[in-house]
From Swiss-Prot:
<dbReference type="InterPro" id="IPR018192">
    <property type="entry name" value="Ribosomal_uS5_N_CS"/>
</dbReference>
<comment type="similarity">
    <text>Belongs to the universal ribosomal protein uS5 family.</text>
</comment>
<comment type="function">
    <text>Located at the back of the 30S subunit body where it stabilizes the conformation of the head with respect to the body.</text>
</comment>
<keyword id="KW-0687">Ribonucleoprotein</keyword>
<feature type="compositionally biased region" description="Polar residues">
    <location>
        <begin position="1"/>
        <end position="22"/>
    </location>
</feature>
<comment type="function">
    <text>With S4 and S12 plays an important role in translational accuracy.</text>
</comment>
<comment type="subunit">
    <text>Part of the 30S ribosomal subunit. Contacts proteins S4 and S8.</text>
</comment>
<keyword id="KW-0694">RNA-binding</keyword>
<dbReference type="Pfam" id="PF03719">
    <property type="entry name" value="Ribosomal_S5_C"/>
</dbReference>
<feature type="domain" description="S5 DRBM">
    <location>
        <begin position="45"/>
        <end position="108"/>
    </location>
</feature>
<dbReference type="InterPro" id="IPR005324">
    <property type="entry name" value="Ribosomal_uS5_C"/>
</dbReference>
<dbReference type="GO" id="GO:0019843">
    <property type="term" value="F:rRNA binding"/>
</dbReference>
<dbReference type="Pfam" id="PF00333">
    <property type="entry name" value="Ribosomal_S5"/>
</dbReference>
<dbReference type="InterPro" id="IPR020568">
    <property type="entry name" value="Ribosomal_Su5_D2-typ_SF"/>
</dbReference>
<dbReference type="GO" id="GO:0015935">
    <property type="term" value="C:small ribosomal subunit"/>
</dbReference>
<dbReference type="InterPro" id="IPR013810">
    <property type="entry name" value="Ribosomal_uS5_N"/>
</dbReference>
<dbReference type="InterPro" id="IPR005712">
    <property type="entry name" value="Ribosomal_uS5_bac-type"/>
</dbReference>
Length: 250
C-alpha cells in the first residue's frame, strides 16, 4: 500500500535534517561580551537650567546666532556646581554646561537642614544675604539663588539679593557665600589648633581678660582723677594763704 505523508510530517522531517548544521553553526558563533559602554550608570547629580539666551556674533559674512545656557548641578548632599555652555543648538549648549558644572563642584557645610550661620556672599556687583531658618520654614529665595540652594541640600533658609540681578553674578555670589561657611568645630580649630581643649580655651580667655584689665584707664576716668587732685590742692592751699595773710597783717 502507498503511504501518503501529510504536510506536518514532511516539515518535521525537514527540521530533523537541518538540526546538525545548526549545531555546527552554534559551535562557531561568537558570544558577545557585555561591554562597559552598554552599562547605564545612574548619575547622582541633578541638573537645573537657570537661563538660556540667544547670542550673536557679527562678522563680515553676517551674523551668526548661537545659544548660551547656564546650568546648576548638585547631589543634594553638600556638592554643587555651576557651568556655562554655548552651541548652535539648545541641547548641545545644555550638555556642555552640565559637563563644565560637574568639573567645578563646591562643597557646602550644612547644619541639619539649614546653614550654620549668617553670611553675605559677593561677586562683582552681585550680593546675596543668606540666613539660617527653623525646621519647616522652607527655602525663601528667588531667582538663580534658589536653584543653587535647592541642589546643595538646604531645605530651610532665608536668602535675599542686595545687588545686581545678573544670573551669573547672583549664582557666583551664592557659591562664594556657601563655600565660606564654617562649623563651630572648624572655627575652634583655626583659633586654638587642631588639639582643641576646653581648659586651654579657658586659659586663653583669662589671659585676654587680665591684659584688658591691666591696660590704661580710658580718658574720661583720667580727667576725673585730675580734677579731683586739683580740688584737693585748692582745699589745702586756702588755709595756708589765710595764715600767711594774717601773719603779714600783724
Amino acid at each position: 500500500m502507498n503511504v501518503v505523508e501529510t504536510s506536518s510530517e514532511m516539515n518535521s522531517n525537514v527540521e530533523k535534517a537541518s538540526t546538525p548544521k545548526q549545531e555546527n553553526n552554534k559551535r562557531f558563533e561568537r558570544k558577545s561580551r557585555p561591554s562597559s559602554r552598554q552599562k547605564v550608570v545612574k548619575d547622582e547629580f541633578e541638573e537645573k537650567v537657570v537661563t538660556i539666551r540667544r547670542v550673536t556674533k557679527v562678522t563680515k559674512g553676517g551674523r551668526h546666532f548661537r545659544f548660551a545656557a547656564v546650568v546648576v548641578v548638585g547631589n543634594k548632599k553638600g556638592l554643587v556646581g555651576m557651568g556655562t555652555g554655548k552651541a548652535n543648538e539648545v541641547p548641545e549648549a545644555i550638555k556642555k554646561a552640565i559637563k563644565e558644572a560637574k568639573k567645578n563642584l563646591v562643597s557646602v557645610t550644612l547644619r541639619n537642614t539649614t546653614v550654620p550661620h549668617e553670611v553675605l556672599g559677593t561677586f562683582g556687583a552681585g550680593k546675596i544675604l543668606i540666613k539660617p531658618a527653623k525646621v519647616g520654614t522652607g527655602i525663601i529665595a528667588g531667582g538663580p539663588a534658589r536653584a543653587v540652594i535647592e541642589l546643595s541640600g538646604i531645605s530651610d533658609v532665608y536668602a535675599k539679593s542686595l545687588g545686581s540681578n545678573n544670573a551669573i553674578n547672583m549664582i557666583r555670589a551664592t557659591f562664594e557665600g556657601l563655600s565660606s561657611m564654617q562649623t563651630l568645630k572648624r572655627v575652634q580649630e583655626l583659633r586654638y589648633g587642631k588639639t582643641f581643649d576646653k581648659q586651654k580655651v579657658a586659659l586663653v580667655e583669662k589671659t585676654a581678660e587680665t591684659k584688658n584689665f591691666e591696660k590704661k584707664p580710658p580718658k574720661s576716668t583720667t580727667k576725673k582723677m585730675a580734677s579731683k587732685k586739683i580740688e584737693k590742692e585748692d582745699v589745702i592751699a586756702e588755709p595756708m594763704i589765710k595764715n600767711e595773710a594774717e601773719n603779714s597783717a600783724e
